[in-house]
Amino acid sequence: MAVGKNKRLSKGKKGLKKKAQDPFARKDWYGIKAPAPFAIRDVGKTLVNRTTGLKNANDALKGRIVEVSLADLQKDEDHAFRKVKLRVDEVQGKNCLTNFHGLDFTSDKLRSLVRKWQTLIEANVTVQTTDHYLLRLFAIAFTKRRPNQIKKTTYAASSQIRAIRKKMTEIIQREASSCTLQQLTSKLIPEVIGREIEKATQGIYPLQNVHIRKVKLLKAPKFDLGALMALHGESSTDDAGQKVEREFKETVLESV
């Protein structure tokens, strides 16, 4: 018999598995609230690690950007091809108050618009709203056949393209720079600017599928809690108690 250490007997409990911890046990759910221009205010929920020590959950949530379909926000399937970006600016209790951060088209919608025998015209404009939000708006338009046209193609001349692009830029500049971000969002939802461009360019060349395909937020002003609360239909002084006036009654001592 060999003299020495029996390796099998001295084997420790290395093979035992550690107790699995649920990662969601250390997390909390927060509701996301959309701003006033949208019909549906409850967007959904987001996860965040619970506040521990110096790590605050509110700090982790602020600045978080969520992408939502406009169809869900407006309860209308006609807007399904448009995506809205919302940015979390403030956390109130278990609710994240958001503001508009951008707009975009789905790639399948953009691809479906591009067809043969027509001219694609694009324009982009950098504008500043009256409440000092710097935005870049991207517009897209396509030429269409004139009434009673026999020719198959609807190609616009270079001079016509330049004239249409100039008109598009003017309309976007006028519509966006004369309103607040909230008012601009209200214009973007029903495609007001697109219809305005279509109407204004009829004399140059008839257009179809005129859209503001993308809105990019370049710069936001200094954060204002009061403005955000007003956007969500709330007041920053809601938590303050109300002064109650009571009738003064003099206390009479029965015995001294």
From Swiss-Prot:
Protein name stated in the entry: Small ribosomal subunit protein eS1
Q: Which InterPro entries match?
A: Ribosomal_eS1, Ribosomal_eS1_CS, Ribosomal_eS1_euk
The alphabetized UniProt keywords are:
Acetylation, Cytoplasm, Ribonucleoprotein, Ribosomal protein
| A GO CC annotation given for this chain | cytosolic small ribosomal subunit
What's the gene? RPS1
Query: Carries keyword Ribonucleoprotein?
Result: yes
Composition bias of kind Basic residues appears in 1-18
Q: What is the lineage of its organism?
A: Eukaryota, Fungi, Dikarya, Ascomycota, Pezizomycotina
**Subunit comment:** Component of the small ribosomal subunit. Mature ribosomes consist of a small (40S) and a large (60S) subunit. The 40S subunit contains about 33 different proteins and 1 molecule of RNA (18S). The 60S subunit contains about 49 different proteins and 3 molecules of RNA (25S, 5.8S and 5S).
Annotated HAMAP family? Ribosomal_eS1_euk
Write out the coiled-coil annotation as residue ranges.
none
Q: Which GO terms describe its biological process?
A: translation
Subcellular location per UniProt equals: Cytoplasm
Q: Which residues carry this modification: N-acetylalanine?
A: A2
Q: Which family does it belong to?
A: Belongs to the eukaryotic ribosomal protein eS1 family.
Report the GO molecular function annotations.
structural constituent of ribosome
- This protein's source sits in the domain of life called Eukaryota
